[in-house]
Regions:
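Ligand-binding loop in jelly-roll beta-barrel domains
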Residues: 89-110
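Short beta-strand His + acidic residue motifs that chelate non-heme Fe in jelly-roll/DSBH
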Residues: 50-52, 70-71, 92-97
Length: 110
């Protein structure tokens, strides 16, 4: 069993996102091929977005740093550090109002 410093990882990913042409960086904490549970830390530089995409399974989003906007259809929620939301089972997008880091947890099909 290995522990991960999410604070340190968030700082590193945010630095990478600021320097990336896409304005984002991510690291898979758990999951991948053969795992139903997948967790990733995603950093977005302020003003950057993850464009609208499908939700491939049950998913939650926890904001670690910053402030983001989750949009799903007509529903919009703005979340700040320490807040959590269940992502609706529909197409959605994520926009960073400022430099932000989120923890995405997903239970999909194998």
């Amino acid at each position: 069993m290995d522990a991960n410093s999410l604070t340190s990882l968030a700082t590193t990913l945010l630095e990478q996102a600021r320097g990336a042409s896409s304005g984002r960086a991510a690291h898979t904490l758990h999951g991948g091929r053969g795992h139903r549970l997948q967790q990733a830390v995603v950093a977005l530089a302020g003003g950057e977005s993850l464009t609208e995409h499908e939700n491939p399974g049950e998913a939650t989003l926890q904001v670690m740093l910053g402030r983001v906007e989750l949009r799903a259809g007509e529903d919009v929620v703005v979340l700040s550090a320490g807040e959590h939301v269940v992502i609706p089972q529909q197409r959605h997008s994520l926009h960073a109002h400022e430099d932000s880091v989120v923890l995405l947890s997903l239970v999909g099909t194998r």
